[in-house]
């Protein structure tokens, strides 16, 4: 563990929102457990990502933490209590956005949010402001049954924010969205973190996880096989090489690679910098996708 990671871990002590220890769960009549001995913590104000292919156990873990599934082994506490030990006040403090839309199709987007707001005892957000934030203001009074798939994906995200939750559970929050609307959702998530909210995110989209998450856990067959910040995971498995793209003597684009160790004293590297027009210089980092495949031997499908 690096000095930075130790500092982060130390700062997380006393501010844990989620603690999972030895968590196991088997669905009735299933041959194998869906979750096998998971262990992790999530600190206040952290964006934590659970990453893995379909069927890895991500959504099951999330449902256990939300309280939708019971009878698990091990420990899964939120604010120092198992979800089953909480009363209705637990759901006043959390927000949930599932991957599959579940709205009232014969109500408008605005009416859906108004209805869900009525279920909370505390103050709630303005539905129109939430719809505007996710790009649905112009369709606020359109029946949800007439919404496109992308619109139906954005509505549950808006709904999850209606009670201004301290802890947000997001399942594939940008799945099925075009780049513009995916950017809106990501920006909201970043803003929520800046406001001290805690976000538990499950996805198989490595680019989204890399961009948003403070730490990620790779999950395969119900087990966590790696857990760290995206940057640390990539650095640990990156090639220590630098690629330079430059204009050759004839004006064509040429490429050269140099080892990072001893780069400051590499005469060939300095020759390229002195004698050619350099277009790009990049270190050869592994992508989070590359790391996942190397660690797990699996593709994200």
From Swiss-Prot:
Keyword Transmembrane helix appears in the UniProt entry? no
Q: Which SUPFAM superfamilies match?
A: P-loop containing nucleoside triphosphate hydrolases (SSF52540)
What's one GO MF term for it?
Answer: efflux transmembrane transporter activity
Q: Give the subcellular location.
A: Cell membrane
Quote the EC number.
Answer: 7.6.2.-
Coiled-coil annotation reads none
Which residues bind ATP per the record?
A: 52-59
Entry keywords, A to Z: Antibiotic resistance, ATP-binding, Cell membrane, Membrane, Nucleotide-binding, Translocase, Transport
Question: This protein's superkingdom?
Answer: Bacteria
Q: Provide the ABC transporter domain boundaries.
A: 18-246
Q: Name one GO cellular component term.
A: plasma membrane
User: What is the membrane topology noted in the UniProt record heading this document?
Assistant: Peripheral membrane protein
Question: What is this protein called in UniProt?
Answer: Fluoroquinolones export ATP-binding protein Rv2688c
């Amino acid at each position: 563990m690096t000095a930075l990671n130790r500092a982060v871990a130390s700062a997380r002590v006393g501010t844990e929102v989620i603690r999972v220890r030895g968590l196991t769960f088997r669905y009735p009549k299933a041959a194998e457990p869906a979750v096998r001995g998971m262990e992790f913590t999530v600190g206040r104000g952290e964006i934590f990502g659970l990453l893995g292919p379909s069927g890895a156990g991500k959504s099951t873990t999330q449902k256990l933490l939300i309280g939708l599934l019971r009878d698990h082994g091990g420990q899964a506490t939120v604010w120092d209590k198992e979800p089953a030990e909480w009363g209705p006040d637990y759901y006043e403090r959390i927000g949930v956005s599932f991957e599959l839309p579940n709205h009232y199709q014969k109500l408008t987007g605005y009416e859906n949010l108004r209805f869900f707001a009525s279920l909370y005892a505390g103050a709630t957000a303005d539905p129109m402001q939430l719809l505007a934030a996710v790009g649905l203001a112009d369709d606020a009074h359109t029946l949800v049954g007439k919404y496109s798939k992308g619109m139906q994906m954005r509505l549950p995200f808006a709904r999850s924010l209606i009670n201004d939750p301290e802890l947000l559970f997001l399942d594939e929050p940008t799945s099925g969205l075009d780049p513009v609307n995916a950017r809106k959702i990501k920006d909201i998530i970043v803003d929520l973190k800046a406001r001290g909210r805690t976000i538990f995110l499950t996805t198989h989209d490595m680019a989204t996880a890399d961009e948003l998450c403070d730490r990620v856990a790779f999950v395969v067959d119900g087990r966590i096989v790696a857990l760290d910040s995206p940057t640390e995971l990539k650095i640990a498995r990156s090639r220590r090489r630098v690629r330079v793209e430059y204009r050759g003597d004839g004006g064509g684009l040429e490429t050269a690679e140099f080892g990072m160790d001893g780069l400051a004293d590499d005469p060939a590297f300095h020759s390229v910098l002195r004698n050619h027009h350099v277009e790009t210089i990049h270190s050869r980092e592994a992508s989070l996708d590359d790391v996942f495949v190397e660690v797990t031997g699996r593709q994200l499908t």
